[in-house]
Amino acid sequence: FEQARKRQKQNPGTQYLGTVLQHLVAAKLCLIMPENSFEIHGASVADGPTDRNGDFVINNTIIHCTTMPGALLIEKCKTNLRNGTHPVIITIFDRVHTALNLAEDAGLAGRVEVWDVQQFLSANVYEHSLFDESKRNSTLSDIISRYNNIVLDTETDPSLRIEFDAK
């Protein structure tokens, strides 16, 4: 995430961090969900034109991936709740409190989940490696491989791929 953040600062107007966040979440979800159980779109594809309620729709849960939670996202969460679905916001650590505060200000405290992406991914790596350090790199490698395939399938910039040497 730090590399994506640095690259984004060097290239104003780009959304590297948000793209990496969204596709790593997708890769993690691919690890646990049955194949084709949810759609994966390019990070720049807006929810509205594609008639989606969020970045990922899985059963009655709507996952929103963002590096900058704001009023528009909270409105989407309100719509999700009105439609009987459960919104989850996955964001960077620095924005978790922002999202929680926005949800609280909108009267949604306790009704919208807000997760730090690094904790979300880390917990998965530990769980799938059964907390065995010798298996952790293999699990991480699997997530990164899935991420790289998602980037190749949905994005035009192959430099978004992650190189990882499992040891």
Region spans (language model):
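A short, surface-exposed helix-loop junction/capping segment
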Residues: 1-13
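Catalytic core segments in nucleotide and nucleic-acid processing enzymes
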Residues: 12-167
